[in-house]
Amino acid sequence: MKVLWAALLVAFLAGCQGKVEQVVEPELEPEPELHQQADWQSGQPWELALGRFWDYLRWVQTLSEQVQEELLSSQVTQELTALMDETMKELKAYKSELEEQLSPVAEETRARLSKELQAAQARLGADMEDVRSRLAQYRSEVQAMLGQSTEELRARLASHLRKLRKRLLRDVDDLQKRLAVYQAGAREGAERGVSAIRERLGPLVEQGRARAATVGSSLAGQPLQERAQAWGERLRARMEEVGSRTRDRLDEVKEQVEEVRAKLEEQAQQMRLQAEAFQARLKSWFEPLVEDMQRQWAGLVEKVQAAVGASAAPVPSDNH
């Protein structure tokens, strides 16, 4: 009997434990996009702009009453367009900055990296454009429903937005990897450029050091007065040379100024002669016309006066 009761007790406890295990829900794993978005907040300017686009898209995905209202008034698509343009502008500027640093890298390597990065950038832009197009399509479909239930449209939009967000995450991850390779190439190119400069300047620096050591050793054996006198002679010769060059240069400048002034005076004289000739030509054109108009005017005045005189003469009367 005791064995039976013990078996029943064990079965009861096992059932209770199974129910408890069914009630306990598993912990939700954090979304990977949260970690990625945290990196955007402290990254490059294009990543900061992308973070603002992502925050706004996540708010749109809630499909709250305010979101639906702004979707119908095209407010959402306008905001997304501005955020998209800002992101692509900052990304283009960052790519140009890296391209300048890639100049020491081989042309083939630079072309390959640029092509891969451009393809990743195009995918991101296309998917962002797909988000905007899908929201614009939703607005058109809702407006066409004419007050009917839009629950199915909202569910379908939410599903599309989830898929698009996953695609955007993949695009951004791929783009960041491409940019990292691009940046590594730029860093390698900069290091190569510095090494090349060192290789070129190294022999010159060594020659300068050797020359300075030679001059120092030669001057060390001379008395101080002789060294000062030698330096003074060199300085005087240098100043005379500079002064001679300066005087020659001033003479050249004076000659050029005189030549320019002579040309300007010649051109001014030519312009005066041309103006006088043009004035005389105008006078020869218009003087006959003015004289003819004066003659016509005088004839017209005489005719008018004659007509007025004839009309003012007394009319003879018929009464005798």
From Swiss-Prot:
Region (Lipid-binding and lipoprotein association): 212-293
8 X 22 AA approximate tandem repeats: annotated span: 82-258
Binding locations of heparin: L164, R165, K166, R167, G232, E233, R234, L235, R236, A237, R238, M239
Subcellular location: Secreted; Secreted, Extracellular space; Secreted, Extracellular space, Extracellular matrix; Extracellular vesicle
Signal peptide: 1-18
GO annotation terms (biological process): acylglycerol homeostasis; cholesterol efflux; cholesterol metabolic process; chylomicron remnant clearance; high-density lipoprotein particle assembly; intermediate-density lipoprotein particle clearance; lipoprotein biosynthetic process; melanosome organization
SUPFAM superfamilies, sorted: Apolipoprotein A-I
Modified residues (Phosphoserine): S149
Sequence repeats (start-end): 82-103, 104-125, 126-147, 148-169, 170-191, 192-213, 214-236, 237-258
Modified residues (Methionine sulfoxide): M145
Name of the protein in its database record: Apolipoprotein E
Species of origin: Plecturocebus moloch
Lineage: Eukaryota, Metazoa, Chordata, Craniata, Vertebrata
